[in-house]
Regions:
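A short, Lys/Arg-enriched amphipathic alpha-helix followed by its capping loop at the start of a domain
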Residues: 3, 15-22
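Extended substrate/RNA-proximal surfaces in nucleic-acid metabolism proteins
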Residues: 75-82
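Active-site mouth loops of central-metabolism enzymes
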Residues: 1-9, 57-75, 94
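Low-complexity, flexible helical/coil segments
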Residues: 39-44, 57-64, 87-95
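Non-catalytic positions within long, well-ordered alpha-helices that form the structural scaffold/packing
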Residues: 17, 82-83
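Active-site-adjacent beta->alpha loops and helix N-cap segments on the catalytic face
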Residues: 10-14, 18, 30-51, 69-72, ...
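A structural motif
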Residues: 21, 50, 85-86
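Hydrophobic faces of well-ordered beta-strands that scaffold small-molecule active sites
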Residues: 3-5, 24-26, 53-57, 89-91
Length: 111
């Protein structure tokens, strides 16, 4: 069984490592159900945390329904985060009918 900590800071990542977490889910703004963390925070955590890092890919507050602009922001975050060395992403995309948006999900997964 893998142990994952959801963290929003470098201090959280360091604590997760001290408690021997296998990976962290790095987010910002948990009060908004989690948003994409800043690139600076991702870089800091990557340099300090030795385990797997998965980041939340959610550029804005609101429903998990996205338009083309939001999807482009998400794709940009995936590319930039991969360059830093993250291990995975966490996201959710729905249609206007609250069903999984398979097309948009496939675009992110295939990157």
């Amino acid at each position: 069984m893998k142990i994952e900590f959801c963290v929003t800071s470098i201090e959280g990542a360091i604590a997760a490592e001290q408690f021997m977490a296998d990976r962290i889910e790095l987010c910002s703004r948990l009060d908004l159900d989690g948003l994409t963390p800043s690139l600076n925070l991702i870089k800091q955590c990557r340099s300090e945390y030795k385990g797997e890092i998965h980041i939340m890919i959610r550029p804005e507050d609101g429903p998990f329904i996205c338009n083309d602009s939001t999807l482009n922001k998400m794709r940009d975050s995936v590319v930039k985060s991969a360059e830093i060395g993250i291990n995975g992403i966490v996201f959710g995309l729905l249609t206007n009918k609250n069903e999984i948006n398979l097309k948009a999900t496939a675009l992110l997964v295939e990157m």
